[in-house]
Amino acid sequence: MLELIVCRACLGCACSFSFAGLGMIAQRIFSPAGFAIAIGLGDSALGIGGVIGEFGVDYFGERLGWREIMLATALIGVPLAIGCAWSLRSKLFAQIQSTKEHDTIPATLTMTRQIQSVLKKREVILAVLIYGGTCGMIMGFGGFWNIPLQEAWGWSPHESVILNSVFFIGTAIGAPIAGILSARIGAKKLLIVGVVISILSYIFDLMFPPQWIMTNVADWPLWVDCVTMFIIGFGLGTSILAFPIATRVVAPEMVGLTISIVNFSGIFFAAILQVAPGVIIQGFQDTTLIALQVGHSVFVLGMLMALAATLCLPSHTQTAHI
């Protein structure tokens, strides 16, 4: 058990480093608007990976053991990651020199002081809350709790996997679109629209089961719930705008740290939102539909936190044009 925990922790660290590295490279190559698109494409890849993982485990789970599946993914992922890193130009990994516009050279500060200087920015704090509520929903709901909820509605395990995969497809499509539109519409407006439609769609899926809505129809079509899942994921795709919101107010040499802080918030809240529903459900005598509904209410609270933080953003919050 200890070995498994250590391996999972190392895997999580590797993923965190890779996302921060992606942000740093994108910030050096692209304009602010291009940075938003690049982060959106990176998050889109995460959504596509979620879809592949869902279908892969569903298909190979009955044919192979979990060890074999993990080994196969490692054999594919490790050389792929090494090849991607090797193909990048070395200057993209060079240290960013601070500009003379700043009184204090961040390189001379301790890590604690650097974190404090970043967290003094109001937009960074708001971005942390935005990404915490939205990424926590994506990882907590899509990463675990969606399938038990769909099975409680009466869908088969295979149909529940399809619904969860459609949720990740929505995030994969919504993230790059949010990055593209942020230069024209503005990050704040996009976030408000995205989070609101996700909240409303999620409440609809949570509170109104097919048996209640269509009491006179024996077969509730799967595609209707697929549309709902897609809308939820699509709206949450705007979560990537938290990164350009946070990084545009810090010095270039602080971008990597800022991305790491925002990303930490998303993973931290994801961990909380994976545990919290289970703690609530344990208060019930059995895992009934009502227990799952009550447990899933924490995801609504997370998205409401993100919405409240978005509303507190300055009205001029907008990514620069490409």
Q: What are the residue ranges of the model-derived segments?
A:
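Paired small-residue
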Residues: 2-10, 223-231
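Cytoplasmic helix-loop-helix junction between adjacent transmembrane helices
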Residues: 7-45
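Helix-loop-helix hairpin linking two adjacent transmembrane segments in secondary transporters
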Residues: 42-93
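Juxtamembrane intracellular "pre-TM" segments in multi-pass secondary transporters
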Residues: 94-126
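Extracytoplasmic gate region of multi-pass secondary transporters
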Residues: 122-175, 273-278
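Helix-to-loop junctions at the C-terminal end of transmembrane segments
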Residues: 174-186
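Cytoplasmic membrane-interface "Motif A"-like loop-to-helix N-cap segments
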Residues: 183-196
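C-terminal ends and interior cores of transmembrane alpha-helices
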Residues: 197-218
